[in-house]
Amino acid sequence: MSPLPSVPSRCRAVIFDWGGTLTPWHSVDLEEQWRVFARQVHAEETQALSLAARIIAAEDAAWVRSRTDHSSARLHEILAEAGLDADHLRREAALAAYREFWEPHTFTDEQVKPLFEGLRERGARVGVLSNTIWPRDYHRGVFERDGVLGLIDADIYSSELAWTKPHPGAFRAAAAALGVEPSEAVYVGDRPFEDVHGSQLAGMRAIWVPHSQIPVGQQVSVDEVPDGVAHELIDILGILDGWQSP
């Protein structure tokens, strides 16, 4: 058997976005998630819909800030802004219903495990950098459930940073967690603004995965062109092999 090709020495790590990249893109009713949550807090529908509307507004504002000034947010902050006390008796039941709503949309793409294994066989470290309001433990639980957590060398979530993508600081934090310079890393994601523009701004190469039907309100036009395009996740191995030095 011939030896596996090596990833170029300049590429020591490949870092992935999560939603829409490592998970297949799903169109989700983003308002219904909070109605499901709020109905666990309030049995009376009018009260539940009022709470849901406040949470929707708080979350929308957080994501607008993410796109404009690239500041991060956390789930507990959004709930507090909507007026739900941290010690509310129904809070945990509501969070359980919210997680159950999201579970079908969190399953890891079946190509991820062989992709991660192929990267590690080529000597590349594997990382994750995701814009998220959810805590680290939630995401790691998803990866563990799907049998890929042990293949990830470092994972960083905006909920534990001051910034979101496309801020260069988020990408630098991911590179540092992997022990590489940004110039030695490749970033893979489905969003031209957050993922392609942001990673290139930080000094990384970018591979775009055009899987996602991103809502118009979340789109930001960019001039940057990705260094590679992967229509299937497993295609990333071939792209990296093609970047080998002669």
Spans of features found by a protein language model:
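Asp-based, Mg2+/Mn2+-dependent phosphohydrolase catalytic module
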Residues: 1-16, 43-46, 113, 117-120, ...
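N-terminal helical cap/lid subdomain that shapes the substrate entry/recognition surface
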Residues: 2-122, 136-137
